[in-house]
């Protein structure tokens, strides 16, 4: 998660200061391309161990697609939130600026909202995640990179505000 939350430059600095002869272990629930590149750079004689079956999100998720003009996206989002029963909603934005903008507008519409992306401080990220898990926030707006690997119970709806670059 540290890498997902924007600590890659810090990890690189630490690794540069480590001795050449060392044992390095990397554990991850998912291995996106940037983590694979880091692993190839950091690990020597690496052994890859995969546990469990790979499952496609499509096996357990019902999908809906709403073609809408860009100018109407937020109005549709509000309509979906008002007309749908949910425990908690995770909204993905492609950009940090977009996530902030969506969150600000949702707050103006009386929704309890947390924001998660790499421009937030570590303290803000922890508070947002803990608040979302506890139910303090009904909506979490996040970039896809920031939210990778997060495990939150009772998320009833996931909304891709922007079309995702990768279907997972």
Labelled PLM ranges:
Residues 1-168:
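Conserved helicase RecA-like core
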């Amino acid at each position: 998660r540290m890498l997902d939350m924007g600590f890659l430059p810090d990890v690189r600095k630490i690794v540069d200061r480590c001795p050449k002869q060392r044992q390095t272990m990397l554990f991850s629930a998912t291995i996106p391309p940037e983590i694979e590149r880091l692993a190839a750079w950091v690990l020597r004689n690496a052994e890859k161990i995969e546990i469990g079956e790979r499952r496609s999100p499509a096996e357990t998720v019902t999908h809906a697609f709403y073609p809408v003009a860009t100018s109407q996206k937020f109005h549709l989002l509000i309509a979906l939130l008002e007309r749908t029963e949910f425990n908690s909603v995770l909204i993905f934005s492609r950009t940090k600026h977009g996530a902030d903008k969506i969150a600000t507008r949702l707050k103006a519409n009386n929704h309890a909202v947390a924001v998660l992306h790499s421009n937030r401080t570590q303290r803000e990220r922890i508070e947002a995640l803990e608040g979302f898990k506890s139910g303090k926030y009904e909506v979490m707006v996040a970039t896809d990179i920031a939210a990778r690997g997060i495990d939150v119970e009772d998320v009833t709806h996931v909304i891709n505000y922007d079309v995702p670059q990768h279907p997972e």
